[in-house]
Amino acid sequence: MGNITAKLVKDLRDKTGAGMMDCKKALNETEGNLDKALEWLRKKGIASAEKKSGRVAAEGSIGSYIHTGSRVGVLLELNCETDFVARGDIFQSLLKDVSMQVAACPNVEYVSIDEIPEDVVKKEKQIEMGRDDLSGKPEQIKEKIVEGRIAKRLNELVLLSQPYIKDSSLTVEELVKQAAAKIGENIKVRRFTRYTLGEGIEKNQMDFAEEVASMQTN
């Protein structure tokens, strides 16, 4: 792997407008080759999408997805900059795909890491710090292990961090950025709600013997 310097990361950011972590990842994937890293970012749809990310996305559409068997349903709001784009095939296809992703990910609760409340992060840290396999380890080592575990756990709760169900080489965030690059507008997943049939309802469970006895008394 090539030597990934801060200057190299800055040069790539200046050329593409991509985020620092995306630039580092691109340079790592291409062994520090600036031209190849630029191409890598473009293929991922990140290079041009990042430059649009600061623009206001106030238009868009609310999509729905009902999974086969009608036991899981999703409502999702996807925003863009213009009504014209919201009606287009690329945007509508993305809306359907991201809604389907939510249906397939029952553990997902938030759109992005930034939305996770601080008390949830603290609770996860307390749980991890109390695990038996960390007892006896130096505090500094323990903190490092816990940090990695928390990051993994929090990413499991975040929609944009999920591997895309139709192509696991992409995350949902990268999928959205690709669409933004194609369209030429900022696109944001604003919010979603996932419904599961019977969720929260206490069911009266009967074992087989009780069920037979009940039928005989009726």
Curated annotation (Swiss-Prot):
Entry protein name: Elongation factor Ts
Region span, Involved in Mg(2+) ion dislocation from EF-Tu: 82-85
PANTHER family reported for this sequence: ELONGATION FACTOR TS (PTHR11741), POLYPROTEIN OF EF-TS, CHLOROPLASTIC (PTHR11741:SF10)
Coiled-coil boundaries: none
Domain of life according to the entry: Bacteria
Function: Associates with the EF-Tu.GDP complex and induces the exchange of GDP to GTP. It remains bound to the aminoacyl-tRNA.EF-Tu.GTP complex up to the GTP hydrolysis stage on the ribosome.
GO cellular component: cytoplasm
Alphabetic keyword roster: Cytoplasm, Elongation factor, Protein biosynthesis
Compartments, as annotated in UniProt: Cytoplasm
The keyword DNA-binding is annotated on this UniProt entry: no
Source organism of this protein record: Prochlorococcus marinus (strain MIT 9215)
Tagged with keyword Protein biosynthesis: yes
Family according to the record: Belongs to the EF-Ts family.
